[in-house]
A protein has these predicted regions:
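Short, membrane-interfacial amphipathic segments enriched in basic
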Residues: 1-40, 215-220
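Hydrophobic alpha-helical transmembrane segments of multi-pass membrane transport proteins
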Residues: 83-126, 211
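Hydrophobic alpha-helical transmembrane segments that constitute the membrane-spanning cores
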Residues: 58-61, 141-170, 203, 211, ...
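Membrane-interfacial helix-loop-helix connectors in multipass membrane proteins
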Residues: 69-92, 160-202, 211-232, 251-260
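Active-site cofactor/substrate anionic-group-binding motifs, chiefly glycine-
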Residues: 47-99, 103
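Final/C-terminal transmembrane alpha-helix of multipass membrane proteins
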Residues: 226, 234-250
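Selective transmembrane-helix segments that form parts of the transport pathway or gating/packing helices
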Residues: 48, 52, 56, 95, ...
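Short cytoplasmic-facing helical segments at TM-TM junctions of multi-pass membrane proteins
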Residues: 116-141, 222-226
Length: 260
């Protein structure tokens, strides 16, 4: 049995350290503006524009399902008009950022790991170093910056479409009064709720891009190595999102909500 199998905890902390170092190096590259704007635009198009269908479907059907489920419970206590306020707050604070990030991790994170993994296997990354070009500047920085820009916007889009779809279900399928639904939704939903979701999305964006790029740049040899790196990138990013969401929620609740 190999040493890596004997020390899974050590390997986990080593990977965490390597990912952290890559993230810090990439931040320095971004602030120093050592990336190419053309690469940034390409990544913005790939992450933001081409993820529209995934985000819209996720937000729309999540809003509809939550509205239909919450209505059953609220109807029992004669609080039908509060259905949409709960849906909106839940999406704004938690589900919007988490679900959108998980979908982007599966779609974009896998693609990033596969792209960089293929470049690693075909020795293109080594060629960049030979040409005195930093792989972090050329490959990682535009991907991380594009993710940091795109994911909060996609999350806001998912929250908005969930509100619209939930309202449509509440009004046209459940027969609720749109005026009361809207007034309750506006009253119980504040800017703090929206900011919580956007801050989480910003944090999750850094997690997805950094882990995906790290896994791709350190993949094994051959097609098997690329496939393994792609799978590990999605799994690691998804688990990290779910775990970090708990701690980020505690911190943001303390800073944004309990102080008000």
């Amino acid at each position: 049995m190999g040493r890596s199998a004997d020390n899974p905890l050590k390997d986990a902390f080593t990977s965490l350290g390597n990912v952290t170092v890559l993230f810090l190096d990439t931040l320095r590259s971004i602030f120093a503006k050592r990336f190419r704007v053309r690469d940034l635009v390409e990544q913005l198009h790939f992450i933001g524009v081409k993820s529209q269908s995934v985000v819209l479907l996720t937000g729309a059907f999540t809003g509809m399902v939550m509205c239909a489920q919450f209505y059953i419970q609220f109807h029992k206590v004669k609080m039908d008009s509060a259905v949409m306020s709960v849906v909106t707050v839940a999406m704004a604070r938690e589900l919007g950022a988490v679900l959108t990030s998980l979908m982007i991790a599966g779609r974009v994170g896998a693609a990033m790991a596969a792209q960089l993994g293929t470049m690693k296997v075909t020795e293109q990354i080594d060629a960049l170093r030979t040409l005195a070009t930093s792989p972090v500047d050329y490959l990682v920085a535009p991907r991380l910056l594009a993710m940091l820009i795109s994911l909060p916007l996609l999350t806001a889009e998912a929250i908005a479409i969930s509100m619209v779809s939930g309202m449509l279900v509440a009004v046209y399928l459940l027969g609720l009064d749109p005026v009361f639904l809207w007034s309750n939704m506006v009253f119980y939903t504040g800017s703090v709720d929206i900011w919580m979701g956007l801050i989480k999305a910003f944090i999750f964006a850094g997690i997805i891009a950094t882990i995906a790029c790290h896994k791709g740049m350190h993949c094994g040899q051959g097609a098997e190595g690329v496939g393994k790196a792609t799978t590990e990138a999605v799994v690691a990013a998804s688990i990290t999102i779910l775990v970090s969401n708990f701690f980020v929620t505690l911190i943001l609740n303390k800073l944004l909500i309990y102080q008000n």
